[in-house]
């Protein structure tokens, strides 16, 4: 859904790096090079960005169930 603010393992702040990571991927960086450019050296922090699935845009397409009027 939304990228976590901190790494689950070490507690480093990573929430502010998501947009920069996506922009680096847009300009043809590889995943590893983009993470290196963001100074994410620990594998626990790297996995937080690599394994994140951004579902918020897909979920916004659904509306809550409307109540039926009699």
UniProtKB/Swiss-Prot annotation:
Q: Name one GO molecular function term.
A: zinc ion binding
Write out the entry's keywords from A to Z.
DNA-directed RNA polymerase, Metal-binding, Nucleus, Transcription, Zinc
Which Gene Ontology cellular component terms are annotated?
RNA polymerase I complex; RNA polymerase II, core complex; RNA polymerase III complex
Q: Which GO terms describe its biological process?
A: transcription by RNA polymerase I; transcription by RNA polymerase II; transcription by RNA polymerase III; tRNA transcription by RNA polymerase III
> One Pfam match, by short name?
RNA_pol_N
Q: Does the keyword Aminoacyl-tRNA synthetase apply?
A: no
Q: Which domain of life is it from?
A: Eukaryota
Q: Kindly list the places in or outside the cell where this protein is found, as annotated in its UniProt entry.
A: Nucleus
For this UniProt entry, which segments traverse the membrane?
none
Q: Which PROSITE patterns match?
A: RNA_POL_N_8KD
Predominantly, its location class is nucleus
InterPro entries xref list: RNA_pol_su_RPB10 (IPR023580), RNA_pol_suN_Zn-BS (IPR020789), RPABC5/Rpb10 (IPR000268)
Residues annotated as binding Zn(2+) are: 7, 10, 44-45
Protein family according to the UniProt entry: Belongs to the archaeal Rpo10/eukaryotic RPB10 RNA polymerase subunit family.
Q: What does the annotation say about its assembly with partners?
A: Component of the RNA polymerase I (Pol I), RNA polymerase II (Pol II) and RNA polymerase III (Pol III) complexes.
Primary role: DNA-dependent RNA polymerase catalyzes the transcription of DNA into RNA using the four ribonucleoside triphosphates as substrates. Common component of RNA polymerases I, II and III which synthesize ribosomal RNA precursors, mRNA precursors and many functional non-coding RNAs, and a small RNAs, such as 5S rRNA and tRNAs, respectively. Pol II is the central component of the basal RNA polymerase II transcription machinery. Pols are composed of mobile elements that move relative to each other. In Pol II, RBP10 is part of the core element with the central large cleft.
The protein's name is: DNA-directed RNA polymerases I, II, and III subunit rpabc5
Q: Which organism is it from?
A: Dictyostelium discoideum (Social amoeba)
């Amino acid at each position: 859904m939304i990228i976590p603010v901190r790494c689950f393992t070490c507690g480093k702040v990573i929430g502010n790096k998501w947009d920069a990571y996506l922009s680096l991927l847009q300009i043809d960086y590889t995943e590893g090079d983009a993470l290196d450019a963001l100074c994410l050296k620990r594998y626990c922090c790297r996995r937080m960005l690599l394994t994140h699935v951004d579902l918020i845009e897909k979920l916004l397409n659904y509306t809550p169930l409307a109540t039926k009027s009699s």
